[in-house]
Every structure is written in structure tokens, then in C-alpha cells.
Curated annotation (Swiss-Prot):
It comes from Pyropia yezoensis (Susabi-nori). This is Uncharacterized AAA domain-containing protein ycf46. The keyword Chloroplast applies. GO terms for molecular function: ATP binding; ATP hydrolysis activity. InterPro entries: AAA+_ATPase, AAA_domain_protein, ATPase_AAA_core, P-loop_NTPase. GO terms for cellular component: chloroplast. CDD domains: RecA-like_Ycf46-like (cd19507). It is found in: Plastid, Chloroplast. Belongs to the AAA ATPase family. Highly divergent. The gene is ycf46. Signal peptide: none annotated. Pfam families: AAA.
Length: 492
């Protein structure tokens, strides 16, 4: 079911109090008044803290700055027809004991009447005492069809002649933005160019990047054709290649369900984060990076709201790649954390979404210490596959040297003895190989000459890799993967 159907069902089932999670107040009001087919006999009352009830014909502005009086108005209104009460700003007062008691009393009364309270909130933090009488649903970001209708409406209102291809491109670029933001960015484009054309697309993408980054939770990386070569990991590459068209219409028509995602487990510096970026580039999809540290930061109760916001943005932007870096740091020691169960609830919401999500969001989670993750995370159905990224073998080290040397010396990389270098750096990660090359370049540059194979050899000999400095952790991770708990990303 979509949002309108969900809301209509809740109203029909006489749910007394509904909290709708959204920042789009105007869009929600429009949906309620038009999509729900509210007739003249069905009254919609709207209240906010500053102006009170703004569409109350008998007393416009009633109950301003008084949320308790706003509830008493609902209680005392005598009307046999369906009445919907939209309460804005009300979520800021939900923890006040007088309002908690009033809402509980009111919920009993309006169950037998044609009254429904809808609280609009962008931060869900329901007091425990109200959990049994309040139902929370999310207003998703506009669908492609909704965005397209708005683009066509705006073009007609502004007397713009847009061809169908441009409309489709603008629509796709606006995916993940609210209707209000779409109107603002279109106005900005008109102010700059006096028209909408192909120059509009980068402006929309930049607007989207800024909006998503302002959440301080997600970072947005638009689709880029940048070549992101990864040395080795042939098994993982083959697995991804088979699924590169999984979000296409042809795949949907074939009956293939959208892939859920990957859990990449491995030693630091083996290419887990680079793999997430490479998937987005190869599959030609935008990339969202979730900062798990910021998910659990802030005030009590905010983590759950942030998780819902992350899900809403990801699904609104889909198809996309959601990259969750170092997920083990967020959920380690989950059952021992003394935060009144917040972490457990956020974790429960997350893994339920992983298992049940229908939107084409491909999750790429990375972990360095798999032992820290709750066992529920590793169950089948959470991710399509768990891959282990080990330290590269000799052939993979040769490939890594070739990639990095060709980046810094695209015309002369062949002069370096890659075979000899790959033999010298046994137990080096890809990141450590890159660092050895950079160190050799610093040495040669300081002496005002070109760096050589010998410089890289010296840098390798001076470098102490993680496999030695954190030997116990590396061997523990290799032993875990060796028991068949994860699929090896490389050919053995």
C-alpha cells in the first residue's frame, strides 16, 4: 500500500491519534484535502502554535499558543461528520504531563466519534505513556510520478516549453527532494538562466547534495563515471557484475527481486570503502554514505528519528547505493549499552528494514571487527552475501601496484619492477602499498629526481604493516572467515 491508502485505512479503522513524520506540511495538507477526497461535510481543522486554528469559521486564531486549549476544542466540537485535526508544532509539547493525560482521555472519547487527530512532526519522540494510543507513519518523499506532475505544472505556470526528454531528466534529477525544494530550485534556475535546459541539471544535483548533507547524517555523491579500479577481489567483482542490471525494468519484468546488499568484512585498507564507491560508479547510481557515529549523536530520542529520516531519504532517492562504513563501531556491545534501549530499538528498526525493504536501495556495509556485530546482523536475509576481504595475494599485489603507479605515472609505469615489488610486500594491504609508493615519491622529490623501483623497495622495508602491528586481530579475522562464515572475495 502507498501512503494515502495507509492513512485512509487508519482513519477507516478509527485510529484516534496519528503522528505523521514529515517536513512537508503543505504537501501533507494537500494530500489530506484532495487525495483523501474530503467532501464538504468533512471538515479539516489546522492548528499551529503561533496562529491557532486558522480555518475555524467561528473563531479564527482560536487556541493560539495554547496546546491544551487546542485539545479541548477537539473534545467540545459537536459535529456528526468526519473531522480531521491537523496539529503542527504539537510534538514539541508531547512530554508535558498535562497533555499526556489529556491525549489519553481524549483518545477514549474520539474512538466513538468521527474525529481523528493528526500530529505533524519531523522528529519522532513519542513518550512511553502514549505509545499505545499513537500510531506513527512516514510521508515518503515525492515519487517520480509526483515530481513529474509538479515539473509539468511549473512549466505551464511559467510558460516554459519543455520537451519530454528534458522533463524526464529534470524529474530524475529532482528525485530525493521535497516538493517545496523542487519549486525553489526551479525558481533559482529561472532567475539564473531565464529558462530550463540541460544547464539546469548540475544546479539541481548540487542543491540535492547540499540538502542531504545538511542532515549531518548522510553524504550525497552523485553518479560519476570516474574509473575506480580495484586490484584483485575477482570473486566479488563477478558477483557484482551478475547483478549490475538488477534495478533495470528488464530485471523487474524477468521477476528478479531487487538485491538487498552486501556486508564486506575485512582487514583495514583492503578496499572495502573503495568497493562501495566502485559499485555506484559501475551501476551508474547515486551513492549515499551514512555516518553511523552521527546517527547515535545528539539528544535522547533523536537516534530513532534520524534512522527514519535516513530510510526516507534513501528510499526517496532510490535506486541508489547506501554505503554504511564501519557498521561494527555503531552496533558493537549492543546489548550492554546503558541508553534505555535506544540503540537496541534503532538496531531493530534497521535490520527489519534490511529484511523487508521493497525500495531498490542496495546497502553496502563494511566492518573491520565482525566479532563486535550482533549475531542478528549476520542472519540470512539481512544481506544477500557476506564477503571477506583478506590481505592481497601476490597476483593481486601486482595488480594494485599497476593501478597506483599508472595513476601517478600514466606514461612510464611499465619501467617499475612490479613483480619484484609484489614479492617484497607480503602481508601488505592495498592502502599500505599505496602509502609505500607515496613515501618513495616524497623521498625522490626532496632530492629533486624521479622516484625509482629502488625507492619503493626502501619504503617497503621501512614500513611496518598492520598484519604485524595488530597481528592477533588480523589472524582472528582470518580464522573467522576460514571457518566458512563468509565468502572469500578473492580467488584462492
Amino acid at each position: 500500500m502507498n501512503f494515502t491508502q495507509d492513512l485512509r485505512l487508519l482513519l477507516k479503522s478509527r485510529y484516534p491519534i496519528i503522528v505523521i513524520n514529515t517536513r512537508e506540511e503543505d504537501r501533507l495538507e494537500y494530500i489530506i484535502k484532495h487525495s483523501l477526497n474530503c467532501s464538504n461535510s468533512q471538515q479539516v481543522y489546522s492548528w499551529d502554535f503561533v496562529d491557532g486554528y486558522t480555518n475555524n469559521p467561528s473563531d479564527n486564531g482560536y487556541a493560539k499558543r495554547n496546546p491544551l486549549l487546542a485539545l479541548e476544542f477537539i473534545e467540545n466540537l459537536n459535529n456528526e461528520s468526519l473531522n480531521l485535526f491537523l496539529l503542527k508544532d504539537f510534538d514539541s509539547f508531547l512530554n508535558e504531563i498535562v497533555l499526556i493525560r489529556k491525549l489519553r482521555n481524549l483518545a477514549k472519547i474520539i474512538k466513538t466519534q468521527s474525529k481523528h487527530i493528526i500530529i505533524i512532526s519531523c522528529k519522532i519522540n513519542i513518550p512511553f505513556a502514549l505509545n499505545d494510543i499513537i500510531t506513527v507513519i512516514d510521508l515518503p518523499l515525492p515519487s517520480l510520478l509526483e515530481i513529474k506532475k509538479e515539473i509539468i505544472r511549473l512549466s505551464k505556470a511559467l510558460n516554459l516549453n519543455l520537451n519530454s526528454e528534458l522533463v524526464n531528466n529534470i524529474t530524475k534529477s529532482c528525485q530525493g527532494l521535497s516538493i517545496d525544494r523542487i519549486r525553489k530550485v526551479i525558481t533559482k534556475i529561472i532567475a539564473q538562466y531565464n529558462q530550463i535546459d540541460s544547464r539546469s541539471l548540475p544546479i539541481i544535483i548540487e542543491e540535492k547534495r547540499q540538502i542531504i548533507n545538511q542532515t549531518h547524517l548522510l553524504e550525497f555523491y552523485p553518479y560519476s563515471k570516474v574509473n575506480r579500479d580495484i586490484g584483485g577481489l575477482d570473486v566479488l567483482k563477478q558477483w557484482l557484475q551478475k547483478r549490475s542490471r538488477s534495478f533495470s525494468k528488464q530485471s523487474l519484468n524477468y521477476g528478479i527481486p531487487s538485491p538487498k546488499g552486501l556486508l564486506l568484512v575485512g582487514i583495514q585498507g583492503t578496499g572495502k570503502s573503495l568497493t562501495a564507491k566502485a559499485i555506484a560508479s559501475d551501476w551508474m547510481l547515486p551513492l549515499l554514505r551514512l555516518d553511523m557515529g552521527k546517527l547515535f549523536g545528539g539528544l535522547v530520542g533523536e537516534s530513532e528519528s534520524k534512522m527514519r529520516e535516513m530510510i526516507n531519504i534513501s528510499e526517496g532517492l532510490s535506486p541508489c547505493i547506501l554505503w554504511i562504513d564501519e557498521i561494527d563501531k555503531a552496533f558493537s556491545g549492543l546489548h550492554s549499552q546503558g541508553d534505555s534501549g535506544t540503540s537496541a530499538r534503532v538496531f531493530g528498526t534497521f535490520i527489519t528494514w534490511l529484511s523487508e525493504k521493497k525500495a531498490p536501495v542496495f546497502v553496502v556495509a563494511t566492518a573491520n571487527k565482525i566479532q563486535s556485530l550482533p549475531s542478528e546482523m549476520l542472519r540470512k536475509g539481512r544481506f544477500d552475501e557476506i564477503f571477506f576481504l583478506d590481505l592481497p595475494n601476490r597476483q593481486e599485489r601486482e595488480s594494485i601496484f599497476k593501478i597506483h603507479l599508472s595513476k601517478v605515472r600514466p606514461r612510464s609505469w611499465q619501467k617499475y619492477d612490479i613483480h619484484e615489488l609484489s614479492l617484497l610486500c607480503n602481508k601488505f594491504s592495498g592502502a599500505e602499498i599505496e602509502q609505500a609508493i607515496i613515501e618513495s615519491m616524497h623521498t625522490a622529490f626532496s632530492e629533486e629526481r624521479e622516484f625509482s623501483t629502488e625507492d619503493i623497495k626502501i619504503a617497503i622495508k621501512q614500513f611496518v604493516p598492520l598484519a604485524f602491528t595488530d597481528k592477533e586481530q588480523v589472524e582472528s579475522l582470518q580464522a573467522w572467515a576460514g571457518d566458512g562464515r563468509a565468502r572469500n572475495a578473492s580467488l584462492t
